[in-house]
Amino acid sequence: METIVNGFNQPNAQASPLAYGLTMVAAGLAIMGAGVVSVGQGMAVAKAVEAIGRNPEATSKIRSTLIMGLAIVETASIYCFIIALLIIFV
């Protein structure tokens, strides 16, 4: 059990250091995709709050549309995270 814990997330004996480094760069790029999605979500929420401030009667329509849009956009972030995990650990 100790060898599994000590060898966790370390390059294999077969993998070259360059391949391991490029793998980590690819995982970092995938996580950057998740960060870009988060910025887009923040902008969408800001515009929704602005729209509710201008037209409070449309709050329910704006909120439901916003939640649906954020759920669709969040899937891209989750996919980026899963891809990064697969790149690192598989």
UniProtKB/Swiss-Prot annotation:
GO terms for molecular function: lipid binding; proton-transporting ATP synthase activity, rotational mechanism. One of its GO terms (cellular component) is proton-transporting two-sector ATPase complex, proton-transporting domain. InterPro entries: ATP_synth_csu_bac/chlpt (IPR005953), ATP_synth_F0_csu (IPR000454), ATP_synth_F0_csu_DDCD_BS (IPR020537), ATPase_proteolipid_c-like_dom (IPR002379), F/V-ATP_Csub_sf (IPR035921). CDD domains: ATP-synt_Fo_c_NaATPase. It is a multi-pass membrane protein. It is found in: Cell membrane. The chain crosses the membrane at residues 17-37, 70-90. It comes from the Bacteria. The record marks 74 as: Reversibly protonated during proton transport. The keyword Cell membrane applies. Keywords: ATP synthesis, Cell membrane, CF(0), Hydrogen ion transport, Ion transport, Lipid-binding, Membrane, Transmembrane, Transmembrane helix, Transport. Its main location: membrane. Belongs to the ATPase C chain family. F(1)F(0) ATP synthase produces ATP from ADP in the presence of a proton or sodium gradient. F-type ATPases consist of two structural domains, F(1) containing the extramembraneous catalytic core and F(0) containing the membrane proton channel, linked together by a central stalk and a peripheral stalk. During catalysis, ATP synthesis in the catalytic domain of F(1) is coupled via a rotary mechanism of the central stalk subunits to proton translocation. F-type ATPases have 2 components, F(1) - the catalytic core - and F(0) - the membrane proton channel. F(1) has five subunits: alpha(3), beta(3), gamma(1), delta(1), epsilon(1). F(0) has three main subunits: a(1), b(2) and c(10-14). The alpha and beta chains form an alternating ring which encloses part of the gamma chain. F(1) is attached to F(0) by a central stalk formed by the gamma and epsilon chains, while a peripheral stalk is formed by the delta and b chains. This is ATP synthase subunit c. It comes from Metamycoplasma arthritidis (strain 158L3-1) (Mycoplasma arthritidis).
